[in-house]
């Protein structure tokens, strides 16, 4: 009965978002069902985001994914045929940089969510560790998410799509984004020739470099996957002290300047 209810919810929500979105992983292929046990599907208001399971009680996503009536699904691959171990949670607490729900489009787009109850690990649900070192420019990065697989006309897959892109130097990003300042705690990643990218409803999903969780999908060009307009990601490594402090119960910890 629980699985039937989850299936019904996912199908209804998918139809709702198909009318409102035109964005997500562009230029990818279906993810292997076993490669994303940490990837969560976040629904709120009339929108969809991704997120990353850090441990049995915590999810990391983008601040602009905050909204009312938030539902968090874990263990999802196909929306039409959910895995038997799909679990649903709602937020117990939300934490933002500078103890504020406000954020700029360009910086500090990060939100920690404490779940209402612990998640049970299973075949399709497992956390992704925080990074132990910063990412290297030029490294291959893995992106993933549900949503439109075409940049203009909406084409939503039932399963998450994955793709490989490269971590770029900030200098390579600057021509497309003059508003991107050196002091921002962000990463720039993509393909300068275009054709592969994350997009709007992929917000909050992870950027994985050399097996480490290094970025959170934040913003980019419109339409997605255009030449010299790569994606911009919140830098997870730069926020480690804040993330670890909040999880440890230190709510007075501050974000990096």
Curated annotation (Swiss-Prot):
Record: active site: 64 (charge relay system), 109 (charge relay system), 203 (charge relay system)
Propeptide: 19-24
Residues making up the signal peptide according to the UniProt record: 1-18
GO molecular function: serine-type endopeptidase activity; toxin activity
Subunit structure comment from the entry: Monomer.
Tissue specificity note: Expressed by the venom gland.
CDD domains xrefs: Tryp_SPc
A biological process term (GO) from this entry: proteolysis
Domain Peptidase S1: 25-248
Predominant subcellular localization, coarse grouping: secreted
PROSITE patterns, alphabetized: TRYPSIN_DOM, TRYPSIN_HIS
Keywords from the UniProt entry: Disulfide bond, Hemostasis impairing toxin, Hydrolase, Protease, Secreted, Serine protease, Signal, Toxin, Zymogen
GO cellular component, as recorded: extracellular region; secretory granule
Its EC number(s): 3.4.21.-
Compartments (UniProt record): Secreted
Organism this protein belongs to: Deinagkistrodon acutus
The protein's name in its UniProt record: Snake venom serine protease Dav-KN
Described function: Snake venom serine protease that may act in the hemostasis system of the prey.
Family membership: Belongs to the peptidase S1 family. Snake venom subfamily.
Pfam families to which the protein is assigned, alphabetical: Trypsin
């Amino acid at each position: 009965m629980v699985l039937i209810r989850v299936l019904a919810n996912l199908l209804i929500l998918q139809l709702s978002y198909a009318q409102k979105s035109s964005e997500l992983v562009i230029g990818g292929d279906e993810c292997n069902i076993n490669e994303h046990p940490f990837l969560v599907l976040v629904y709120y208001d009339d929108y969809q985001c991704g997120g990353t399971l850090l441990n049995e009680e915590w999810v990391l996503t983008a601040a602009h994914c905050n909204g009312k009536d938030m539902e968090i699904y874990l263990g999802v691959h196909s929306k039409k045929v959910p895995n038997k171990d799909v679990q649903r949670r709602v937020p117990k607490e939300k934490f933002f940089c500078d103890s504020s729900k406000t954020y700029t489009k360009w910086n500090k787009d990060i939100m920690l969510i404490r779940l209402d109850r612990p998640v049970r690990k299973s075949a399709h649900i497992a956390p992704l560790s925080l990074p132990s070192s910063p990412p290297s420019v030029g490294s291959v990065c893995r992106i993933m998410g549900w949503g439109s697989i075409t940049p203009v006309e909406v084409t939503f897959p039932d399963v998450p799509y994955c793709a490989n892109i490269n971590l770029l130097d900030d200098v390579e990003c600057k021509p497309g984004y003059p508003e991107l300042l050196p002091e921002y705690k962000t990463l720039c990643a993509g393909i300068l020739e275009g054709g592969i990218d994350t997009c709007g409803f992929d917000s909050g999903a992870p950027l994985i470099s050399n097996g480490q969780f290094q970025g959170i999908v934040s913003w980019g060009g419109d339409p997605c996957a255009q030449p010299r307009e790569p994606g911009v990601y919140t830098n997870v490594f730069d926020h480690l002290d804040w993330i670890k402090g909040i999880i440890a119960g230190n709510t007075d910890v501050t974000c990096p300047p």
